[in-house]
């Protein structure tokens, strides 16, 4: 008996439909074709265990599974659920009449419970585009996928629930999310506020200009002058995300597996601050099957590079093209993937190796040659892409001890 079940492969931040064809006939062999990776091939053992634990027998017939289109590499364990359902459907354990109405994805544990997957949001968007009635995914991913309108999103806790759903013995949990209500309720709630900052009026003004015009900015100052504190508060004065920007940002974090369990739309601009030991691949994205890097996770938000000269020079130089093009294309033998990279770059650095060049009270111990060598770690082409460069002077004690609150982020946004 030939059965078709539908899943999806995520490439970049978009999904592609995968048709899983399962044919059951006389014999006792198992074949899985269609360019699966090792994790997909290992699904056979997970499915056997999951079925046994839940009181079902593995079909003893000859089973051939084809994952089409065959030119797309299928990776990861998220195909466990559609493969298991397809095998049971071909063996007539499951009624096949509803299989073509739903798209299924989920990783199986040995006890049959479903584990969360990456890319649930782009998968849900693709399911709606193709006219599916709904999708069945792990419960942990349902809020993320339920932001897609006009699509039924069902959450399942284990394999048995899905089997009984297709046999009309049990209803799965149908998840609804009021996308607009959730988006606008959380939009302007920030943990950090500019009212915490004492003094630094000129730096605040520069950050306001950067926020209003989308300009990159470099903060140069001694240790303890407040560079990081100011940079971390920049998202609180940026224009609020639009619903379209929020959806795109959420897709990127969904593909990277960075959304927390039960998370829905990202309603605030992301802030990413990687350590200076980061590799080039982690910054730009990549891998055998390309995943978003820090510059893509900062899309529509802020990328903060603290201690800029301490970053590997190659890591800094690869930022030049994404800063210009607002996108990055990662090329591999098997595929080319494009990720968006429209972010505001905020960088900070000390003025010299010791950190106290031009300090009002402390003496610098660096020679002119050491200072120049330190500054030369940042190339001219990269500095040319940073529109605003401002010196951050340490705040005197008198201003630090002032009990009056500073201007709030909400007031700055209204200017």
Description of each model-found segment:
Residues 1-218, 222-225, 266, 331:
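Peripheral, non-AAA+ core regions of ATP-driven protein-machinery
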Residues 139, 306-308, 333-334, 347-352, ...:
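A short beta-strand-to-loop transition that corresponds to the Sensor-1 phosphate-sensing loop
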Residues 170-209, 213, 240-295:
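P-loop NTPase nucleotide-binding/switch module
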Residues 218-261, 325:
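Walker A/P-loop
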Residues 221, 285, 307:
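The Walker A (P-loop) glycine that initiates the GxxxxGKT/S ATP-binding motif of P-loop NTPases
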Residues 271-274, 290-300, 330-350, 362, ...:
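AAA+/SF3 P-loop NTPase mechanochemical coupling elements
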Residues 275, 291-324, 356-359, 379-385, ...:
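Conserved AAA+/SF3 P-loop NTPase catalytic/coupling segment centered on the Walker-B
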Residues 338-342, 352-415:
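Phosphate-sensing "switch" segment of ASCE/P-loop ATPases
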């Amino acid at each position: 008996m030939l059965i078709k079940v539908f899943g999806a492969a995520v490439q970049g931040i978009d999904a592609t439909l995968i048709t899983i064809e399962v044919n059951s006939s006389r014999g006792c062999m198992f074949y899985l074709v269609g360019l699966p990776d090792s994790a997909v091939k290992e699904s056979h053992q997970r499915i056997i265990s999951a079925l046994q634990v839940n009181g079902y027998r593995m079909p003893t017939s000859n089973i051939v599974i084809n994952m089409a289109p065959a030119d797309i590499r299928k990776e990861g364990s998220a195909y466990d659920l559609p493969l298991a359902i397809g095998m049971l459907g071909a063996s007539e354990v499951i009624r096949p009449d509803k299989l073509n109405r739903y798209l299924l994805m989920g990783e199986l544990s040995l006890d049959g419970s479903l584990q969360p997957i990456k890319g649930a949001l782009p998968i849900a968007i693709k399911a709606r585009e193709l006219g599916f009635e709904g999708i069945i995914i792990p419960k942990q991913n349902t809020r993320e996928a339920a932001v897609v309108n006009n699509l039924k999103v069902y959450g399942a806790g284990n394999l048995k629930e899905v089997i009984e759903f297709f046999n009309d013995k049990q209803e799965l949990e149908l998840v609804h999310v009021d996308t607009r209500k959730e988006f606008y309720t959380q939009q302007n709630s920030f943990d950090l506020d500019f009212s915490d900052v004492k003094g630094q009026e000129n730096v605040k003004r520069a950050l306001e200009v950067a926020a209003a015009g989308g300009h990159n900015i470099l903060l140069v100052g001694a240790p303890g002058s407040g560079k990081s504190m100011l940079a971390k508060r920049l998202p609180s004065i940026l224009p609020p995300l639009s619903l379209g920007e929020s959806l795109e940002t959420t897709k990127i974090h969904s593909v990277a597996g960075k959304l927390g369990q039960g998370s829905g739309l990202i309603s605030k601009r992301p802030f990413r601050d990687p350590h200076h030991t980061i590799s080039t691949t982690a910054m730009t994205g990549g891998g055998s099957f390309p995943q978003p890097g820090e510059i893509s996770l900062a899309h529509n938000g802020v990328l903060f590079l603290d201690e800029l000269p301490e970053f590997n020079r190659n890591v800094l130089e690869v930022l030049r093209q994404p800063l210009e093009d607002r996108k990055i294309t990662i090329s591999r033998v098997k595929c080319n993937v494009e990720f968006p990279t429209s972010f505001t770059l905020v960088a900070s650095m000390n003025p010299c190796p010791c950190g106290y060049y031009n300090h009002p009270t402390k003496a610098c111990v660096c020679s002119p040659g050491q200072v120049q060598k330190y500054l030369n770690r940042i190339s001219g082409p990269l500095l040319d892409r940073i529109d605003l460069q401002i010196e951050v002077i340490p705040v005197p004690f008198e201003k630090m001890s002032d009990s009056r609150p500073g201007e709030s982020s909400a007031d700055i946004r209204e200017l």
